Every structure is written in C-alpha cells, then in structure tokens.
Amino acid sequence: RLLKPLEFYLSKYGTAFYGLNRLHLLMQKQHNRGQDGAGIASLKLGMEPGRRYISRIRSNADSPIKEIFSKIGTELKEIEEKYPQRLTDTDWLKNNLDSYGELYLGHLRYGTYGKNTLLNIHPFIRENNWKTRNLVLAGNFNLTNMDELFERLIDLGQDPVETSDTVTILEKIGHFLDEENEVLFRKFNKQGLSNREISTEIAKHLDVARILGQAAKTWDGGYVIAGFFGHGDSFVMLGFESITQHFG
C-alpha cells in the first residue's frame, strides 16, 4: 500500500513503477516455495465514477510470475514506443494502465489439492457497485471446519454457487462487510445525508477490525489472509496456529 502520492515515488526513486517493482520483488522472494499459479490485484484510489479501479491478472503457466509481469512489460513497451513521455506521467498511467495504482496484492498458489485452473488462483474478487462493498482477497489457509462454515452461509439465506474454501471465506467476510455497510447507511441516512454523502462517510467510518473479527470468530485452523476493500482499506489476518510465510 503506497502511503504517499504516486508522484513522490517518481521523484524519490526515479521511476513511476516503484509499487509494481516492490510487488514483483516480494513475489520473487516466495519463488522457491513452489508455484502452481500466481496472481496480482491492484487498486486505484480516487477514480471518477465509470472508470475501472480494481484490476487483476492471474496465471497458471509454468512460470506464472514471469508471465504476469511480462504482460505488464509488454504494455509498458507499447507505451514507450508510442508515448515515451507518458512513462513519467503518473496521472496518465493511472488512467490508462490497468495494473497501475496505489495498492497491490500478490499471491503464489501452492496447490496441495484442488484444480489449478485460473478460477482457482487468487486473488478472488467480490464485486459490487458500491466501493465499500467490494472485497479482494488472497490467502493460504487450512481450516478444519469448512463444511460448518458453508452451512452457516446457507443458514444466513445465501445460495453459494461454489463450495470451495476460498469462496466460503470470501462470502463469510463479505456478509459482515455488507452488514457493516447497512448499519452505517442507516446511521447517516437518519442524519439527512444524501446517498453520495453517505458513501463517502461509510468509507471513512468502516470498522475493518470488527468486520474481520466477526467473520473469523468461527474459523478453526491456521490461516494468513490479505485483502482490501474498494475504497482503499487493506488488511492482513494471521491465525494463531499459522506458520505461513507472507510479506507486507
């Protein structure tokens, strides 16, 4: 998560791609743990309505990290050939390069079981038209009560289209994210705020710790999970029984 404006990193490090370079380096640090796939997601802050602000690239190639960053490199080479001056224009890059933003999430898949199709590769996205209801998630976990967690989703009235562990975790967090949004919406609606104003206030007051605490209360096992919401709040969750390697 870049804590300063994009122009700061261009000025200090001489490159507009400090965030992407760091993500690449951190993913390479886990290169030796085995790869059955890899994926990255990025978030652009402050985008105007109608512009995509979450992007994702996933690969199940033999060298997935290489393929992911080769795709980005190909885009950059085309920009360099056509508009070389744009490589130092952070505003232009943010509006024209999908993977360019202020927040990055990367994951390496080590498939102990399950299929290694692109659909099984993290990060996973739970999309919504409200920024504060968007959820992007990646992680490694070994929870022993997945069947119970899935049944709890059904008891809530949901009808999940998949039974995978990751989708169950995604929807579990998503349920409490939706609840938090509803509570805050009612609060600010009573104060007479417009819907636009309410969306801004929800982003300021969303209680991330409460959402994650409620979601993880019934998890049994080890896990490390990282993610972010569409308005920019990000998190890392580490279970008490976890020894999984991660970098932030």
At which residue positions do the language-model features occur?
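Conserved short alpha-helical segments that host acidic/polar catalytic motifs at enzyme active sites
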Residues: 1-248
